[in-house]
Amino acid sequence: MIRMGFFLTLTVAVLLTSLICTEAVPTDKRGMERLFDQVLLKDQRNCPYCVVYCCPPAYCQASGCRPP
């Protein structure tokens, strides 16, 4: 009984999290481009040699930039 309650709670938490995350992401193409541009500009301010936000911190350090 306790095990079933745990899995039910876990399932609800996962569904709620996925619902919240999908609402935060723009669905139209222009919105996605704006979001990508914002991330790219923020990353270029932190490390001009890192083009993508998810570049490894070791790459930024090797190029002389501080990691994002």
UniProtKB/Swiss-Prot annotation:
Subcellular location per the Swiss-Prot or TrEMBL entry: Secreted
Propeptide: 25-45
Signal peptide: 1-24
Tissue specificity annotation: Expressed by the venom duct.
Keywords from the UniProt entry: Disulfide bond, Secreted, Signal
Keyword Secreted assigned: yes
Lineage top rank: taxon: Eukaryota
Iron-sulfur found in the keyword field: no
Family, as annotated: Belongs to the conotoxin U superfamily.
The protein's name in its UniProt record: Conotoxin Vc7.3
Organism: Conus victoriae
